[in-house]
């Protein structure tokens, strides 16, 4: 997007640089309504996955939009009809992160990219909704216990 009229608007444009936290509440770059008119605006709650970036050598950035936003071409978006299923998919993908990085990322001469057809064919177990809720609650409890530790200097030793 080399047109200067496309930039400095108020519409978030998420890139892999923004995918550092589980929920995206803003982006470094914003585009104009003119630029957004030719792009899809994804609603809050959409899952985003980095599909092409050097970061895929070691991490699989996966986030949930906390705002309506556009995305760049290096990101894949998953809009699910059920917010609870979206949360389950988030944790399901994170659980398979080591496998995905090892088996489903290809290195080419310029940048790593996700073998998206193979990723899309990957099966993630989906238990009954009541079991999903129980597992997600347990994960959140564990994450809440770990959060204070991450700011403790002894934790990073």
Give the residues covered by each predicted segment.
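Short coil/turn segments at secondary-structure boundaries
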Residues: 1-6, 104-106
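Sequence-specific dsDNA recognition surfaces
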Residues: 1-3, 15-44
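Short beta-alpha junctions and helix-cap segments that line functional grooves
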Residues: 1-2, 60-64, 74, 110
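Short, ligand-facing micro-motifs at secondary-structure edges
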Residues: 19-30, 47-71, 87-91, 99-104
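Short, glycine-/Ser/Thr-/acidic-enriched flexible segments
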Residues: 19-20, 54-56, 76, 83, ...
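A short glycine-rich beta-alpha junction/loop motif
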Residues: 68-76, 87, 107-126
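Short, conserved charged micro-motifs
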Residues: 83-88, 133
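Amphipathic alpha-helical coiled-coil/heptad-repeat segments
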Residues: 98-99, 117, 121-157
